[in-house]
């Protein structure tokens, strides 16, 4: 089984599990062994799924401002958790390929494998929710047709992205490409780099 076939299966399981209750406060019950890549992939997609629904809720024009601020804080934390998890997944890949002999003419990729996996997780969410739109009983046929066309593109994109990730991993394994990972260095959550926060400490 290719890496992305496994990843897409885990992503779909996480999305389906979330929608059993469809509640942003539902505690996660990760079915995979702690420390396994499946565990990290499931957690990654769970975070993405919860945040997807955060973003829906905060766009409600009738939302209470206090509630919106609290939700924005949760979104900020979710973004940081997501970034941390991507870096954990890259650490997994570095461990897997640590003994690979890199070829003299090896090239670097534009992004690390885990950031491509991040996009694959989001794509699984887009596909799930676009399918919902296609199946909406009260929606017009015009709406369903438009959404079906979009769904077809998303499914094609999923195939292409999955293929690209698997090919990248094959190239890394063969030494034709090498991983170079940079920390994201987000500044807005850091009290020492966000001017609003560090100016309050004066």
What are the language-model segments listed below?
Residues 1-202:
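Anionic, Ser/Thr-rich low-complexity intrinsically disordered regions
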């Amino acid at each position: 089984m290719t890496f992305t076939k496994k990843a897409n299966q885990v992503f779909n399981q996480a999305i389906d599990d979330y929608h059993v209750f469809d509640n942003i406060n539902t505690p996660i019950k990760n079915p995979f062994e702690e420390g396994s890549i499946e565990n990290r992939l499931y957690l990654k997609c769970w975070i993405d799924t919860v945040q997807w629904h955060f973003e829906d809720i905060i766009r409600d024009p009738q939302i209470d401002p206090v509630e919106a601020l609290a939700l924005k804080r949760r979104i900020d934390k979710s973004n940081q958790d997501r970034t941390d998890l991507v870096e954990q997944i890259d650490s997994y890949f570095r461990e897997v390929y640590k003994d690979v002999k890199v070829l003299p003419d090896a090239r670097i990729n534009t992004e690390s494998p885990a950031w491509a996996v991040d996009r694959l997780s989001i794509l699984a969410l887009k596909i799930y929710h676009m399918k919902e739109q296609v199946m909406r009983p009260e929606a017009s046929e015009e709406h369903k047709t438009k959404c079906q066309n979009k769904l077809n593109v998303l499914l094609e994109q999923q195939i292409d992205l999955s293929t690209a990730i698997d090919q990248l991993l094959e190239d890394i394994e063969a030494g034709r490409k090498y991983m170079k990972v940079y920390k994201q260095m987000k500044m807005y959550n850091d009290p020492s780099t966000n001017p609003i926060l560090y100016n309050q400490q004066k």
